[in-house]
Amino acid sequence: MKTDLKLTRDLRITFSVDTPDHGRVHVHSLPLARSIFETFVLELGETYSKVFGSYDPKHVAMTAPQMALPALRAVAKRMGTWDGAGGLEVGLINELARLTNVAHAGPGGWEQLPIHLAHQRGILDDDTHAEVLSSLVFFFLTLRVGPDVLREDTLRMASSARGWQYTSLGFTEYLASLPTSTPVASTTKKRSSVIG
């Protein structure tokens, strides 16, 4: 994965999380469209102010990814825009989930699922699912709401602390870049026991 990529608004985020029952899983998410930002600009702006209120960038990089989704939910509920067909839960969180895939080690190699199926099937428990979504909300807030001058530093610090990577790869190409999830068969020749 390239580490010298320019952090543009069309980058994808990838990271790994350790799950209680399924070991390490890999998350890959596409960026949300600008239209999502424009639809929920008031809620996102207020959430950004709450989550990024600290002047210490290290504090923001360490704590903000866990606070982003709960803060966004609280802001939207207070504004009356969380629930319903046009609400933030459907319009932003469900769209974020639609753009996010999970890879976990299965018997035949990496198995890929949309994040909502990984959650429904228990690959991501409730806490891990919420942690992943909150990290993705933080990433989106940083890319779309934050000023350009802070974006790169914030994402570099967060990625350093959390093992995040940013890529231009699609999910299939990202999976191909992962280490093999099944044991590789030995290719050493065995000595023949046939005599004569």
Residue ranges and their predicted role:
Residues 34-196:
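Short, surface-exposed, charged amphipathic helix/loop patches that serve as local interaction elements
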Residues 1-35, 42:
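Short N-terminal edge-element motif at the start of the domain
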